Amino acid sequence: MAGAKEIRSKIASIKSTQKITSAMEKVAVSKMRKAQMRMAASRPYAERIRQVIGHLANANPEYRHPFMIERAVKRVGYVVVSSDRGLCGGLNTNLFKALVKDMAVNRENGVEIDLCVVGSKGAAFFRNFGGNVVAAISHLGEEPSINDLIGSVKVMLDAYLEGRIDRLSVVSNKFINTMTQQPTVEQLIPLVATPDQELKHHWDYLYEPDAKELLDGLMVRYVESQVYQAVVENNAAEQAARMIAMKNATDNAGDLISDLQLIYNKARQAAITQEISEIVGGAAAV
């Protein structure tokens, strides 16, 4: 019965792991719902501020904010939003693949790259992969604040204003739904003012103190809000990916337990049959 004992011990070990993955799945579900609420709360602001910038740009067409001026691209910056923890499937791996692909295109064109990394997994990746990381922040927690991001974002904005980078993009996972998280590379600046549907009505607005000053203030807020929205959405995507990963692990553990239980039953049956055969053989000899 030595084999049966080993199998029984393995079954007990897998059941213990299954309890852990099941608990982690339930925790991820709870955290995902909270993250979805934060994402839904911040999304209207992030979307609306871009519309307001479009209005302001059209209100003062002769003024072009530095963040709206296209120039020759010699160096680009990326704000890379990753997770602090693992056990979330291929979430970070898929994000890094999309980023590396975009970086390769820039490098083929002779464009240099600077990186601002959010999350421990991103920092660990670039320590191995290599890259010019000029700013990094991690351990934002389950409820990130925009104030925690301002310092790192300012490093990239100052680099753009001083001409050290010519384009800034944010790289993060978009939360499509519970089953789908999509890695995206989205250009932040220079921002191209897109005509808004409301502008077709030629409505007039009064701006105090004036459109130029408002635009100067809003452009920085716009970039900060977009990075914050990326962090919040990435958090929701992380929890969804972790929930799915832990559910798959729990289900796989159940399948493995069933297979081992069958093997255990066969081993036990074989041992009992062997014992009966030995008893019958001994009785016949007597």
Swiss-Prot record:
The keyword Magnesium does not apply. Keywords: ATP synthesis, Cell inner membrane, Cell membrane, CF(1), Hydrogen ion transport, Ion transport, Membrane, Transport. GO terms for cellular component: plasma membrane; proton-transporting ATP synthase complex. The keyword Transport applies. It is found in: Cell inner membrane. Its main location: membrane. One of its GO terms (biological process) is proton motive force-driven plasma membrane ATP synthesis. It is a peripheral membrane protein. InterPro entries: ATP_synth_F1_ATPase_gsu, ATP_synth_F1_gsu, ATP_synth_F1_gsu_CS. One of its GO terms (molecular function) is proton-transporting ATP synthase activity, rotational mechanism. Transmembrane segments: none annotated. NCBIfam families: ATPsyn_F1gamma, PRK05621.1-1. Produces ATP from ADP in the presence of a proton gradient across the membrane. The gamma chain is believed to be important in regulating ATPase activity and the flow of protons through the CF(0) complex. Belongs to the ATPase gamma chain family. PANTHER family: ATP SYNTHASE GAMMA CHAIN, ATP SYNTHASE SUBUNIT GAMMA, MITOCHONDRIAL. F-type ATPases have 2 components, CF(1) - the catalytic core - and CF(0) - the membrane proton channel. CF(1) has five subunits: alpha(3), beta(3), gamma(1), delta(1), epsilon(1). CF(0) has three main subunits: a, b and c. This is ATP synthase gamma chain.
